[in-house]
Amino acid sequence: MLNPKFVRNNPELVKTKLQTRKVDPAEVDEYLQLDQQNRDAITKVEGLKKQKNQLTEQIGQSDPQSEAGQALIQQVKQLNGDIKSTEAAQTEVNDRLHYLAIRFPNLPADDVPVGPDEDSNVEMRKHGDIPTFDFKPKAHWELGESLGILDFDRAAKVAGARFVYYKDAGALLERAVYSFMLDLHTQKQGYHEIIPPYLVNAQTMYGTGQFPKFKEDVYTVESSGMTLIPTAEVPLTNYYANEILSEDQLPTYFTAMTPCYRSEAGSAGRDTRGLIRMHQFHKVEMVKYCKPENSYDELEKLTDNAEEVLRELGLAYHVIKLSTGDTGFSSAKTYDVEVWMPEQGVYREISSCSNCLDFQARRAMIRYRKADGTVDYVHTLNGSGLAVGRTVAAILENYQQADGTVKIPKVLQPYMHGMTEIK
């Protein structure tokens, strides 16, 4: 949620920035008008209540049966009616104001490229050599099926499209990948490992910005209203919801490996085969809480934490800065890390690292007390470290051999019981 005081004091800047994120400036004008009406109503109610209190004191000092006393009583009754009608009108205004406020995305940072979609994203850097093959590389799903480690057909039989069974060395590889990631984040990068709930309530989904805008993208259990998490960002960011931290608790880093559940409502026809776009998948998530003045430095570190996983795995990648039209709802600035996929001959997203500033903290009421005693909102950041299934896909494609076998990256071999290849 945006800082209402900032919106109030910088209306043209806010309209310009939100317009780059496909928000009609007229909605900002409506918000500002309602905000003024709401504050005027609050002031009016306070004034009416003050008058009522003064009259009530006068009634207590007079004869209520006298003409003057009766007049005072009638004035109080009139004030009660005015207070009730003003509060009712204010409630209506406030409801619409809140409706707009929770649907405004975050304001993009000044250095975010302006553009309507992914075509306006900017490449920041590349790392690693793109592998060359003296044979036509196969897609990861072909390799997985021929090696007997991925079974999409039987998964479709029991759950439908966009599900998979991992088998034998495939299951071991998946487990090895996320175990390696968690060890790197916790043992080297300073993260605390969390195993969070995989079902959360609606308020928690609201806190990180998934609700109300993206309800169609998730799975909700109708009997309870609980939602299967689309990412561990949701429970990790809400860990400190409605709390005031001490300054010495910042920064705090959390990581978790969880299943993630997504309906992929807007993805019909895209990535219909393989591990790239699933309804259920594992992901290692990184979440940071920090002081406002440090959040952009923390974003650079967070992105490097994700990149380090790929460097250790020996996978080529590049980093792009997302444009205003491609940046996520809650984010002010996002880097996507994309890994090279040989069969398609393109880079594909494997991590998205975002600085949300105080946007999520305002929704989830996460604050900290400064040394001088004042209270401010923390800044929150999140990033994939990494999407596990996509990492498995990248390993299968980049480490495949001409005979259809797949070599295992050295850093994963200790997690694979010493296995050096899948055959």
From Swiss-Prot:
Location (main, coarse): cytoplasm
Record family assignment: Belongs to the class-II aminoacyl-tRNA synthetase family. Type-1 seryl-tRNA synthetase subfamily.
Function: Catalyzes the attachment of serine to tRNA(Ser). Is also able to aminoacylate tRNA(Sec) with serine, to form the misacylated tRNA L-seryl-tRNA(Sec), which will be further converted into selenocysteinyl-tRNA(Sec).
CDD domains hit by this protein: SerRS_core
Its EC number(s): 6.1.1.11
UniProt-listed InterPro entries: aa-tRNA-synt_IIb (IPR002314), aa-tRNA-synth_II (IPR006195), aa-tRNA-synth_II/BPL/LPL (IPR045864), Ser-tRNA-ligase_type_1 (IPR002317), Ser-tRNA-synth_1_N (IPR015866), SerRS_1_N_sf (IPR042103), SerRS_core (IPR033729), tRNA-bd_arm (IPR010978)
Oligomeric form and interacting partners: Homodimer. The tRNA molecule binds across the dimer.
Organism: Lactiplantibacillus plantarum (strain ATCC BAA-793 / NCIMB 8826 / WCFS1)
Binding site for L-serine: 231-233, 285, 384
Reactions this protein catalyses: tRNA(Ser) + L-serine + ATP = L-seryl-tRNA(Ser) + AMP + diphosphate + H(+); tRNA(Sec) + L-serine + ATP = L-seryl-tRNA(Sec) + AMP + diphosphate + H(+)
Name of the protein this chain belongs to: Serine--tRNA ligase 1
Residues annotated as binding ATP: 262-264, 349-352
GO MF annotation list: ATP binding; catalytic activity, acting on a protein; serine-tRNA ligase activity; transferase activity
Subcellular localization: Cytoplasm
GO BP of this protein: selenocysteine biosynthetic process; seryl-tRNA aminoacylation
Domains (record comment): Consists of two distinct domains, a catalytic core and a N-terminal extension that is involved in tRNA binding.
